Every structure is written in C-alpha cells, then in structure tokens.
Amino acid sequence: MKPEFLESAEFYNRRYHNFSSSVIVPMALLLVFLLGFATVAEKEMSLSTRATVEPSRILANIQSTSNNRILVNHLEENKLVKKGDLLVQYQEGAEGVQAESYASQLDMLKDQKKQLEYLQKSLQEGENHFPEEDKFGYQATFRDYISQAGSLRASTSQQNETIASQNAAASQTQAEIGNLISQTEAKIRDYQTAKSAIETGASLAGQNLAYSLYQSYKSQGEENPQTKVQAVAQVEAQISQLESSLATYRVQYAGSGTQQAYASGLSSQLESLKSQHLAKVGQELTLLAQKILEAESGKKVQGNLLDKGKVTASEDGVLHLNPETSDSSMVAEGALLAQLYPSLEREGKAKLTAYLSSKYVARIKVGDSVRYTTTHDAGNQLFLDSTITSIDATATKTEKGNFFKIEAETNLTSEQAEKLRYGVEGRLQMITGKKSYLRYYLDQFLNKE
C-alpha cells in the first residue's frame, strides 16, 4: 500500500470516528425523533374509578307486611325467583282463626239459602223438592204447610157435608109440611062442601070428611031450623080450626124451605196460606242475603290480613336484599326487605354505577365512552364498553369529599349476562380526550390537570 493512502485512512479515522460522530450525533437524531413523535403521537386521557353493576330498572320493592315474627324466610341475595314464589311467611295471629270462622259461617249461610230456595220452590209448586232431609227444618216446615192445607180441605169438606145434611133435612121437613098443607086444604074443601050441602039441602058424597056430621043433621030432621043452624055452626067450627092449622103450616113451610150455601172459600184460604208462607220465606231470604254479604265482607277482610301474613314474588326477577333487615326475624310493617331486579339474561342490559370526585367531574360529560372491567376474578375478566348516560347535578357528601354519581347503561350478550351478577365491583375507565405525549408530559411536569 502506498504511504499516501495510509495517511488518508488515518486522517479519515481521526476525522469521522471520534466521540462526537459515534455518540452525540446519534443521540441528537434520537432526540429529534422522540421530540417529533411526542409532538405528533397522541395519548388517550382517561379517569378510573370503582363501579358496580346495577339494574337498569327496579321491578318492585318488597316490603314487610306484618309486625309479627318471620317464620319462613326465602330471601337470598341474587336469588332468581318466579312470580308467586313464597318469599316470607309470618307467624299467624288471631286473623287465622277469624278467617276460618268466617269461611265456616259463609258455607253454612249458603247451604241455608239453598235449602230455603228448595222450600220456596216446594211451596210454589206444591211438591217436595228437597233432595234430602235438611238440618234447618225447612222440609218439616213444608210438611206442616201440607198438613195445614189438608186440614183446611178436610174442614171445608166436613162443613159442606153438614150443610148438605141440613139442607136435605130442611127439604124433607118442607115436603112433609107441604103434604099437611095439602091435606088440610082438602079437609077445608070437604067441610065447605058439607056446609053448602046443609045450607042448600043438596046431597053429600059418602067419602067427604064431614059426611058423618051431615048424616047426623039429616037424622035429626032437615025441617028443624035449629038443627040446621047447629049443624052449620059445627061445620064452620071445623073449618075455622082447619084454617088456623093451615096458617100455622104455611108459616112452618116458609121457614123450613131456607137452604144454606155451601162453603166456597177453600181456594182463597189455600192461596192465603201459601202467600203467608212464601212471604215468610222471602223475608228470610232477604235476611240471609244480608248475612251472606256481611260474612263475605268479613272473610275478605280476614283474607287480606292473612295475605299480609306472607310475601310472594310479584313477578319473575332477581332478589337484592336490604342489608339493614336481612338478618332480622322481626321487621316493622312497611320496612324494605328487598328489591326485585330484572333477570340479566332476560333484560339483556345493565347499568354501571360509579362515583367520581368533584375535582374530576368537569372533565367528563354525558356521551363520553367508558370501559368497565371486572376485578373479582382476574383470570376470567369481563369487559363492557358503554357511554355515560347520566351525571348527577349535585354532589354526594362523604367523609372523603364530594362525589358525583355517574351512570352508564350497557347492553349485554347472553354470555356476559350469564357470567355477570348484580353488585359485582370493577374498574370503570372514562375516556376524557386525547393529548400529544409532549403535552401530556409537560402537564405532568407542570402539575396541570
């Protein structure tokens, strides 16, 4: 190698392979690159706080319905219940006995009304419609009614028989008197004929009743005026006596001919008897209807009191217990026992609730993106992305300062809903914006938010 080339190589090494070219220049280039990157590249700015999974809505507040002791308690945190499931049962008081008493009384009154309606139908139709002997005596009442109606019929029949007998006797007496009248009239005619024969001197038939008197007159001498006067006087005396008897007979005849009317009020008597019984039945039915209403009202009241002796689920859902009453065996009426949340699987969404210090709340707004990460199981974490849906207008005061309540509603997949539980705690990251790295570190250095 030529000596001049060696000199050039040594010069080159001395010129370009010194400390400045080996360290300072690369460092300067790296610094320029980092400064350029820090100026151009951006960092997401976020806030982090604790958050819990809450329901998107509350289905029902489960309150204590009695001051009595709790005998059965099926309330459990995050327990899935169906509509109608028994949750709490209290010790029964006097309302249980009262309810049974009203129920028994109501059954008896309804049975009594049914039997009374059988009596009403039997009275209306005159036939026994009772399927069996009743314990209220209504069938016996119907039998008494039938007996009374029978007595009325028998009495009327007997009365009519007596009247018929009396009428027959009156008719017979009248006929006999009529015969006497006819006979007396015939006798009077005979004596009148005899009188005429004596006075005129005519002959008299032998079958005439006064023929013997006429013969006696004839035998004494017709020419003797005194005899004729005596004979006429005797005949007139007989006629006068017969006419007196005839007048008496006619009076008797007129009195004996009266006929008594037969008893004709049986139908009205029977109808009156039926009406009396039906009116009484109607009154009893009205009273029974009132008693039934009172018993039903009492039973309903006692039933409501009994219903207060147990608490059931109003619909399907998940239980969240009130920690203040969950371990108590006696809870005041009206106190909150638990809340019923919708099932996450069926609802398909949940609400994330967090509290943020008042010094950071100005950096977030409704609509900002958030990410929730579960922390209870590091090996099986869940990540939920959502946006802020509400920020409380006023802060909640605590010992650690003032905090604002933040809520974010998120939709869940079926897999997420199956793994998630109400009340699970996690970390909630809120994306508040972006800064260049240069600006970020500058703010950190200057202690700016």
From Swiss-Prot:
Membrane topology type: Single-pass membrane protein
Transmembrane segments: 21-41
A GO term from the CC aspect: plasma membrane
Extracellular topological intervals: 42-449
Residue spans, topological domain Cytoplasmic: 1-20
Main localization (coarse): membrane
Keyword field: Cell membrane, Competence, Membrane, Transmembrane, Transmembrane helix, Transport
GO BP term (any one): establishment of competence for transformation
Entries under InterPro entries matching the protein: MesE/LcnD (IPR005696), MFP (IPR050739)
Localisation per UniProt entry: Cell membrane
The keyword Transmembrane helix appears for this protein: yes
Function: Required for induction of competence.
Protein family: Belongs to the membrane fusion protein (MFP) (TC 8.A.1) family.
PANTHER family tied to this protein: MEMBRANE FUSION SUBUNIT OF EMRAB-TOLC MULTIDRUG EFFLUX PUMP, TRANSPORT PROTEIN COMB
Protein name: Transport protein ComB
